[in-house]
């Protein structure tokens, strides 16, 4: 009988990327943290849902902190040291995610709010009556 063929999965190579950009998208329901190099290629990402939170707990500041720590840990393994932070959205996890990145050991050089604001574009959805 023939010997079984060994399957080798794709192994991610350890890149040395000292500078990067952290994109934090914080909505009322979830927080997504993507860490890219300066040209925009994603190095690591995490979200409150990927960190194990479900339902309404994904929108909490603690879930955003956990997601930011997980993404920062993987970026530090790739050799990242300095980051620029771009924050988008009105969610409750904005500040805690930034604080978690700082505590993880990444040096923040810039924080910019890039939340899209309409110049009277589409009509807003009607107000909820609860």
From Swiss-Prot:
GO terms for biological process: translation. The keyword Methyltransferase does not apply. Gene3D superfamilies: Ribosomal protein S11. One of its GO terms (molecular function) is rRNA binding. One of its GO terms (cellular component) is ribosome. It comes from the Bacteria. Keywords: Ribonucleoprotein, Ribosomal protein, RNA-binding, rRNA-binding. Pfam families: Ribosomal_S11. InterPro entries: Ribosomal_uS11, Ribosomal_uS11_bac-type, Ribosomal_uS11_CS, Ribosomal_uS11_sf. Located on the platform of the 30S subunit, it bridges several disparate RNA helices of the 16S rRNA. Forms part of the Shine-Dalgarno cleft in the 70S ribosome. Part of the 30S ribosomal subunit. Interacts with proteins S7 and S18. Binds to IF-3. Belongs to the universal ribosomal protein uS11 family. This is Small ribosomal subunit protein uS11. It comes from Prochlorococcus marinus subsp. pastoris (strain CCMP1986 / NIES-2087 / MED4). The lineage of its organism: Bacteria, Bacillati, Cyanobacteriota, Cyanophyceae, Synechococcales.
């Amino acid at each position: 009988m023939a010997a079984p063929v060994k399957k080798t999965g794709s192994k991610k190579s350890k890149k040395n990327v000292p500078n990067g950009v952290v994109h934090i998208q914080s909505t009322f329901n979830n927080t997504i943290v993507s860490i890219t190099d300066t040209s925009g290629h994603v190095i690591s990402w995490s979200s409150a849902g990927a960190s194990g939170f479900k339902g309404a707990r994904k929108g909490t500041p603690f879930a955003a902190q956990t997601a930011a720590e997980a993404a920062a840990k993987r970026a530090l393994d790739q050799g990242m040291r300095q980051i620029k932070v771009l924050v988008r959205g009105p969610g409750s996890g904005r500040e805690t995610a930034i604080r978690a990145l700082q505590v993880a050991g990444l040096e923040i050089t810039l924080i910019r709010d890039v939340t899209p604001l309409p110049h009277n574009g589409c009509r807003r959805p009607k107000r909820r009556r609860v």
